[in-house]
A protein has these predicted regions:
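Proline/glycine-enriched tight loop/beta-turn segments at coil->beta junctions
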Residues: 116-123
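Alpha-helical metal-binding/catalytic segments enriched in His/Glu/Asp
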Residues: 112, 126-172
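A non-catalytic alpha/beta surface segment that caps or lines the substrate-entry region
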Residues: 38-115
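Short, flexible loop/turn elements at secondary-structure junctions
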Residues: 3, 90, 114-116, 128-130
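Bacterial Sec-dependent N-terminal signal peptides
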Residues: 1-20
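Short helix-terminating capping/connector loops at secondary-structure junctions
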Residues: 79-84, 120, 168-172
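Second-shell loop/turn segments in exported
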Residues: 22-31, 49-62, 96-101, 139-150
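Stable alpha-helical elements in mature extracytoplasmic
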Residues: 20-27, 32-42, 58-72, 110, ...
Length: 172
């Protein structure tokens, strides 16, 4: 949690030289460890988020996790008059492309993009690793809840989107 706050602080200091110190403190203080913990719990609840796991089930696997993350980003966007652009990035990886790719897989990243109000070509891109795995990298059916294997990072990313969506930045 401290590392996450440090990264958020450094990010905000770097992109927002025009923002007041008070506004930066407001942004940082609005980060909620309870929301982050709730999001980690939700991500763990998908059982496994292995790259090769189920993409159809509404409650289990990488597909369910991706849909939930996308829905969270869309809720955040709706709360800020669509200040976030929510997108999917697809990449087909063929079987045999690596030691742990035992079947063709469509890898999908979920992105939330907050454009600068001055220059729309400048933006903050929020995304993170979604997947999790257990010791056997080719076991994509058994539970691998991964609270500390990408769930915490993705939960931090969702929280960053929640917090940053309340502000508009002038990335000159």
């Amino acid at each position: 949690m401290r590392n996450w706050l440090l990264l958020l602080t450094l990010f905000l200091a770097g992109v927002s030289s025009a923002q007041s110190s008070n506004e930066l403190y407001q942004i940082i203080s609005s980060v909620s460890k309870e929301r982050i913990q709730a999001d980690v719990t939700t991500l763990v609840g998908f059982g496994t988020r292995h790259t090769l796991s189920d993409t159809i089930s509404p409650v289990r696997g990488i597909g369910a996790a991706r849909r939930w993350i996308k829905a969270e980003f869309k809720k955040i966007a709706a709360d800020c008059s669509n200040c976030l652009e929510v997108r999917e990035q697809h990449n087909l990886v063929s079987k045999g492309s690596g030691d742990r790719i035992v079947k063709d897989v469509n890898i999908v990243n979920i992105l939330a993009i907050q454009h600068s109000k001055k220059n729309p070509k400048r933006f903050v891109l929020m995304s993170g690793d979604i997947d999790s795995r257990i010791s056997d990298p080719n076991d994509y059916t058994n539970d691998s809840p991964g609270a500390n294997d990408n769930a915490s990072g993705m939960a931090g990313t969702i929280e960053a989107a929640r917090v940053l969506s309340k502000y508009r930045f002038d990335y000159g």
